[in-house]
Amino acid sequence: MKKSTHLLIASILAGCITSCSSGKRIAQHRIVTNPMNLNYRFQPKDESRREAADPVLEYFKGYYYLFASKSGGYWRSEDLAGWEYIPCTTIPTLEDYAPTILPIGDTLYFTTSSGKTQIFKNAHPEKDTWEAVDTKLTYRLHDPAFYSDEDGKVYMYWGCSDKDPIMGVEVDPKDGFRALGEAKALI
């Protein structure tokens, strides 16, 4: 009985060893997890919390551009794995919350939540050479977002309240993002 048990165990082990050492290799895929080592800032007041909230990402001229609140700059990447940080001093509202960006043609546009709506543009965002747009949009935007429809129309929507609705209006980017009509409650 002992011999048959030993023989059975030896056979199982031999089978396992043979199958494990077969010439077949399992393809290994690189797994990327959180490849960005963002230079998050910390809020200096009250409890210490990390910043860089409200991320927004757009593909523009072969690169992904990422903006986040209170980050002192923005990032770009060709492959979403390797990121280059671009410090920014030419957008005075960069340190405000809730950025939004919009590529139109060869230009990238930027705005944030601020007391006065200011929009900036840059045809070469790999460089910190942003210029102010003569902004004609007069609504005070809280958590704004650009939206470009398939028909070429551009909209701005905004809102962050437990009482007020999310608002939206069609805008004309060729005329300082002037509102085309009245803002409407969307939600």
Regions found by a protein language model. Give the residues of each.
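Bacterial Sec-dependent N-terminal signal peptides
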Residues: 1-24
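Carbohydrate-active catalytic/glycan-binding domains of CAZyme proteins
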Residues: 20-187
